[in-house]
Each structure stands twice: as structure tokens, then as C-alpha cells.
Amino acid sequence: YQLMDVMKEYRPEHERMLWGLGLAGNAFKKVYYDPQLQRQVSLFVPAEDLVVPYGASDLASAERITHVMRKTENELRRLQVAGFYRDVDLGSPNNTLDEVEKKIAEKLGFKATVDSRYKLMEINVNLDLPGFEDPDGIALPYVITIEKNTQTILAIRRNWNPDDPRKLKRQHFVHYGYIPGFGFYCFGLIHLIGAFARSGTMILRQLVDAGTLANLPGGMKSRGLRIKGDDTP
């Protein structure tokens, strides 16, 4: 009931995740409480929008997990009015697409250089926050949200259960892998058969070119060409 009736986005988001999983080899789901909907939500997060440190082996042991989010001006304002983010003036959105985003836009069939949305960096990190230090000197898990263009901190939230004596971080992300790799990321069909697809495309083009030349009724006749009998080209 919770997944099918209450969380209306669960099925379409999960289908999007499964479609991208086989190709890219990695896909993520984010499960969290949405202050606007006032309920739990489960959203698909593409691999390019989730950044982990080099050398991380899994989400549980990663020292930092950064979720790149994009919010319209109205969406961000609603969250500020709801008290989820600080009510500060960020100016107009000025988000220039990076190379990865431009390539993705090209694959989708359009060309873009700017995005009229705010880019927010939601960072799950262990932090020794001044004024809230742990007596044992241990960095505690927090969720920090920063607007990328202005580097403005919008929110800092505790990411552990207050009743947990060990103060372990709460995990909001689920990693789905297609074929296990040698590190954090897994392999997908693009990695496994991408080279064969390129080779097949090259061979097919060569066959088409050879067939075209063999069946083309034309050629060149030089001035000094010797022709025997009626063998006129």
C-alpha cells in the first residue's frame, strides 16, 4: 500500500532506474522524507549525479557522498518558506552546464549550455562542527546543502539518530549494480559489449561502401585509353 498507493512516484522512478542500470552498470535510489509532500519518497539518482571520493568501496564506508540536485527558483523558494533551507537571497540562477551535462544533452537530441535551475550540492559527510564537537573528538555525520554558484550554505542537519549511542550515519541512498567491478562502480552493457558494437558498426559501413562501389554503373575514361572492338565503356 505504501509503495503502490501513497508513494506514487515509486514505480516510474524504479522503472527508470532499471532501464539505466543495464546500460551504465550503476544506478542509485534516494529514500528520504520530503517536507513538501510530508511523506517518504523514493527517487532515481543517475550515477553522474552522485559523487563519492576516489577509493571508496561502498556507500556505507564512504567518507563523503555528494548528491547533485537541481531546483527551480519556485521549488527552492517553497523549501525556504517551509523552513527546510535558510531564507537567504541567492540571486537569479546562473548554472553553466559542465562537459558531462552537455554530452548527456547531446545524447538526448538537443544542445544546451545553461540550465535555468539552481544547482545544489547535498553533502553527506563526517564533520567536527565547531560548537557541537563530540567529547571524544570524533567527526559526526551531517548533511550539508550548498548552492554551487554562490557557495552559500543553505542547511546543516544532523544525520544520526539521537537515541543511537554510536552515532552512526543514516543511509539515504541505495546502490544498484549490474555486474560487480573492481572498485566502487560496477560494469554495464556499454562496458562489456561497447567495443563489439563499435567493431560491428565499422564492418557494416565497410560492407555498405564495398557494395555501393561494386554496383555503381560509372567510372572514368582517360584520353589515352585503348579500346578493342566495340568494348566502349
Locate predicted features.
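Extended alpha-helical, oligomerization-prone segments that build pores/tubes and scaffolds
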Residues: Y1-P233
